[in-house]
């Protein structure tokens, strides 16, 4: 779809700072690039390749692929960031292309910043494009290790 942000990212028109974390025929993952300034480190987007708005529209193969990638990427985020928890959120309101936000929740995150406003914590780990690229390289390595059964 021409105007869809995630379709544009996947076809290379808007490449993510950290590059592609994972891609196959059904799913795609990249680190979120939401801010002009320092980026929250550990916010990964898992998307369907096919432009489809919600879970109810998935084929069984797509649903399996999304679920498996969420699990693998969550483990990789915990290993690479030291996160205590990885939040998975889906709203489907702004961009009608199925995507799940995986967000690392770091140790010491105050209770006021738990759940949906975790990225508002002023002391949360943030970084420039180089820091995002470095984290993404570690995430790709962790995903490769997971594929070999190492994590």
Predicted regions and their residues:
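HIT superfamily nucleotide-processing domains
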Residues: 1-151
């Amino acid at each position: 779809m021409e105007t869809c942000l995630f379709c544009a990212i996947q076809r290379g028109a808007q490449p993510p700072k950290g590059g592609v974390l994972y891609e196959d025929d059904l799913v795609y993952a990249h680190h979120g690039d939401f801010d002009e300034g320092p980026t929250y480190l550990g916010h990964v987007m898992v998307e369907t390749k096919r432009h489809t708005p919600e879970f109810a529209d998935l084929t069984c193969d797509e649903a399996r692929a999304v679920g498996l990638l969420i699990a693998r990427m969550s483990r990789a985020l915990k290993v690479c960031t030291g996160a205590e928890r990885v939040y998975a959120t889906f709203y489907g309101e702004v961009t009608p292309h199925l995507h799940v936000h995986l967000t690392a929740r770091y140790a010491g995150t105050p209770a006021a910043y738990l759940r949906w406003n975790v990225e508002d914590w002023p002391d949360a780990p943030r970084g420039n494009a180089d820091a995002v690229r470095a984290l993404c390289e570690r995430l790709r390595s962790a995903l490769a290790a997971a594929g070999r059964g190492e994590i």
